[in-house]
Amino acid sequence: MGEGILGREDMPTLIENPTIIQAAGTTPKKIREYAGRVNSGHTQVSVAHMTSPEGWEEPGQRPEFEEITVVLRGMLRVEHEGGVLDVREGQMVVAKAGEWIRYRTPEPGGADYIAVCVPAFSPATVHRDVDSP
């Protein structure tokens, strides 16, 4: 077998550390990308651990990728064209490609969550609103 992006294609690849990525929105959020365009060269999927403080919010977006989010701690508020979902610890939300969504962490303590994007997250395909925070 040949060499892939991360090494030999016939063996599992250990990713020892994530890449810390600058976040959009107010009140800095920590993004640790484990798999994706930046840390591992994956273009078909990205996996990131997010830590968002109380009061964090980002601009609305209409991404070209599906985003699957599992909340590990706290509550993640997901605004969408049909209303609002409060996603709590142990719950998951799926935002389909092309849907308008906006994420916030309004409650004390913020939230920790895992975001999986298919295909991988890209600033060029997230399509953030220009007129929101």
Where are these regions (language model features)?
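Short beta-strand His + acidic residue motifs that chelate non-heme Fe in jelly-roll/DSBH
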Residues: 58-60, 78-79, 95, 101-108, ...
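Short histidine-centered beta-strand/loop micro-motifs
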Residues: 36-37, 57-63, 85, 104-106, ...
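Short acidic-glycine-tyrosine-enriched beta hairpin
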Residues: 82-98
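Short, conserved beta-strand element in jelly-roll/cupin
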Residues: 49-53, 62-78, 116
